[in-house]
Every structure is written in C-alpha cells, then in structure tokens.
Amino acid sequence: MRTTILGLTLALLLTPSFAGEYQPVDVTKLPEVKQTKLGLYLSAPEAYKMKSEGGANLLFVDIRTKGEFQFLGTPTVVDHNIPYMEIDDPASWDKKNNRYTMSPNSDFVGAVAALATRMNRGKNDPIILICRSGDRSSRAANLLQEAGYTKVYSVVDGFEGDMSPAGRRDVNGWKNANLPWTYKITEGQAYIP
C-alpha cells in the first residue's frame, strides 16, 4: 500500500500541468472587442466575489449558447442562461472564422427583462454577464445598455478564458481561477423561449 501511494504521489509530481497559471486581466489594456459603452468590467474572481457578497441584489446571466451552458458547465452562482447568440438552425459554416455560423438571439433583451421582472430587479440593478472569453458579453452589455440598463458588467475573461499561444484556453477565466462551477443545471436556469 505504501509503495502504491508513493508511486502515485511521484506520478502526480512528475506529470506536467496542462493548465497555465491564472493570469489576472488588466482592464486598462482590454482589446476593443471586449470594451463596453458602460465601461463596467469584472474579472472572474471579482464576479464571484460580487455575486457571493451581493447576490440577492443582482442578476448573474450566462450568455453562452444552450449547448455550451449544458455541456461545458457553468458557474455555480449563475442565476440563468440566456444566450446572446445561437448556432444557426439549419446549420451553416462560417468559412472566415472556421466554425458554425452564429446569429444574435432576437429574444435576448426581452428574456433578460422577463428574468429581471421575475426576480424583482429593475434597469438600475446590477447585471453580470459571462460568456466563454469576454467577447460576446461585451456586445451583450452594449445591447442591454441601449435598452436602458445602467449597471451591466462584463466578465472580461469569461468562463473558459483567453487562448494561450499554444491554442488552449488556459490563461484566465472562471475555470482557470478554480472558482466553483458545475455541470448540473436546473430547469429554472435553463433558457426555454
């Protein structure tokens, strides 16, 4: 038994780590695609802290596609999934970006408004948006700002984080910060238009 434990310990110590060390995001150097009109930004750890400390007063919305939400997991403190964009149905291919074509969810603002009403929140209450890496959440924040929402925060490193030079999402983000997340979602969190 002692030999087995020693062997497993050595194997773990000698195994290279595939995830990089979490790198905080410098919001003063955000690329244009992650900037919002309101200029309200949170890193994943800041979003977790804000929701944990003031969760009853704000909405935390995962705006990734239903597939991402269901199969890649979500922060445990997320209130609801409302996709900002969805993969087109029927599916088509985006040759420029080498992926399925995605289009904005025409129900996004209405679904956020309905969720806010159900949770007794108004347009001046804080909303946190999270996507994969911060690009979609910035565009969604701008859309909500145009609809009159005044405190929309974008999680600039998202759920999975930015891509490293090696092509993996292991730089930052919710998962790489080792914040609590789950594959278990509830019907109450699901986006069912």
Predicted regions and their residues:
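Rhodanese-like catalytic fold shared by cysteine-dependent sulfurtransferases
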Residues: 20-45, 50-54, 70-126, 137-193
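Short hydrophobic beta-strand that contains or immediately precedes a catalytic carboxylate
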Residues: 59-64, 82
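Conserved G/P- and acidic residue-centered "switch" motifs that form tight phosphate/ATP-binding loops
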Residues: 134
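N-terminal signal peptide c-region/cleavage motif recognized by signal peptidases
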Residues: 14-17
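Glycine-rich nucleotide phosphate-binding loop and flanking beta-alpha elements
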Residues: 67
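Positively charged n-region of N-terminal signal peptides that target proteins for export
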Residues: 1-4
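Short, surface-exposed ligand- or partner-binding patches at beta-edge/loop junctions that are enriched
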Residues: 130
